[in-house]
């Protein structure tokens, strides 16, 4: 076992990629924005990453495809499209650790579903640290840590936390009460509702 402090910050940085709630995109082409973390990625690498995370179709549909010039912060794209570019960038960077900070916040349900699929592909074979209020984002995690007022109040898998009927189960039931993985009696206990929708 080695301590993180034994590594130089630059060395650690090469192994970590971040996808933020509001992705950083710069004025430049889509190709350049995806290639940002690695100069060695060629057109095939960029397109493969975009296909993997589900961004290729929207990129190919743009008049200049991967050569489309982005405005500052990617203002000429939707938030969901910017997120997908950020996922493609993280995939091309081939980092071992991914930090996803509210990566699905402020997007519609359809786009969230696309991004959930992209997230699953992006996290394959990597360690992911996912900071989320949308609990569907962490549902498949090996370990969920629930914080309240800066303190850890629960840890476990989705199934274990639902069964425990604690804070996670209450939040999940309030947001996703129609999902089949919440037993009716649990839904009633955590929400106080007698009727199931």
Q: Can you name each region flagged by the protein language model?
A:
Residues 121-130, 138:
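Conserved catalytic loops of ABC-family nucleotide-binding domains
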Residues 101, 108:
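ABC-family nucleotide-binding domains
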Residues 6, 31-72, 120, 125, ...:
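ABC ATPase nucleotide-binding domain helical subdomain, centered on the C-loop/LSGGQ "ABC signature"
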Residues 93, 100, 124:
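Conserved signature/switch motifs of ABC ATPase nucleotide-binding domains
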Residues 52, 60-61, 117, 134, ...:
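C-terminal portion of ABC ATPase nucleotide-binding domains
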Residues 87, 131:
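Hydrophobic anchor residue at the start of the ABC signature
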């Amino acid at each position: 076992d080695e301590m993180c402090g034994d590594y130089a910050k630059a060395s650690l940085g090469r192994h970590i990629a971040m996808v933020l709630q509001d992705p950083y995109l710069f004025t430049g082409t889509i190709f350049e924005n995806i290639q940002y973390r690695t100069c060695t990625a060629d057109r095939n690498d960029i397109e493969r990453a975009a296909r993997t995370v589900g961004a290729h179709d929207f990129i190919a549909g743009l008049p200049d495809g991967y050569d489309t010039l982005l405005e500052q912060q990617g203002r000429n794209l939707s938030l969901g499209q910017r997120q997908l570019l950020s996922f493609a960038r993280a995939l091309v960077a081939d980092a071992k650790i991914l930090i996803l900070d509210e990566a699905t916040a402020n997007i519609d349900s359809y786009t969230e579903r696309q991004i959930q699929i992209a997230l699953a592909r992006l996290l394959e074979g990597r360690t992911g640290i996912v900071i989320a209020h949308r609990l569907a984002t962490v549902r498949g995690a090996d370990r969920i840590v629930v914080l309240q007022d800066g303190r850890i109040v629960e840890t476990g898998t989705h199934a274990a936390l639902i069964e425990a009927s604690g804070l996670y189960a209450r939040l999940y039931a309030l947001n996703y009460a129609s999902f089949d993985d919440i037993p009716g009696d649990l839904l009633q206990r955590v929400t106080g509702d007698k009727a199931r929708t």
